[in-house]
Amino acid sequence: MPRRREVPKRVILPDPKYNDKTVAKLINILMVGGKKSVAESILYRALDIVESKSGEEAVKALKKCLDNIKPALEVKSRRVGGSTYQVPVEVRPDRRVSLAMRWLIKYSAARSEKTMTEKMAGEILDAFNSRGAAVKKREDTHKMAEANRAFAHYRW
């Protein structure tokens, strides 16, 4: 824990197209090398594809997709008496969103479609329907936490 003052959270302005902070945050995480316009075009085109395929509003579909990816529990390493235990802990709300967005982008990039737009749209649709690699990552994280439930009393 830092002993100095707490650093204030930066205010993120909503994105211009959907006027939504979640979309703006996802664009910022998707951005590589400061190329925001590229990240915006990838995400906006992906959301257009999602809207046409799912029939649901793009932002609503994205938020439902992120809700399906957000982990409730995770494991953290804790060293006790010479051995390291994987201790299950609850995930803070802001970290849940952050992890969900990172996993969405990571597993989108790993897909086999041609362009990042198609990959992103495919992963959003899969997560929207509670399947896909990002949702599997969440399930695996929960399984790890459940398997190490015996060490829950080591929480700090």
From Swiss-Prot:
Q: What is the recorded function of this protein according to its Swiss-Prot or TrEMBL entry? A: One of the primary rRNA binding proteins, it binds directly to 16S rRNA where it nucleates assembly of the head domain of the 30S subunit. Is located at the subunit interface close to the decoding center, probably blocks exit of the E-site tRNA.
Quote the protein name from its UniProt record: Small ribosomal subunit protein uS7
What are the record's GO terms for cellular component? small ribosomal subunit
What are its GO biological-process terms?
Answer: translation
Which family does the record claim for this protein? Belongs to the universal ribosomal protein uS7 family.
Cystine residue pairs: none
Q: Which UniProt keywords apply?
A: Ribonucleoprotein, Ribosomal protein, RNA-binding, rRNA-binding, tRNA-binding
Query: What NCBIfam families does the entry give?
Result: rpsG_bact (TIGR01029)
Which organism encodes this protein? Trichlorobacter lovleyi (strain ATCC BAA-1151 / DSM 17278 / SZ) (Geobacter lovleyi)
Q: Which domain of life is it from?
A: Bacteria
Q: Carries keyword Kinase?
A: no
GO molecular function terms listed in the Swiss-Prot or TrEMBL record: rRNA binding; structural constituent of ribosome; tRNA binding
Keyword check for Metal-binding, yes or no: no
* Summary of subunit composition and partner proteins: Part of the 30S ribosomal subunit. Contacts proteins S9 and S11.
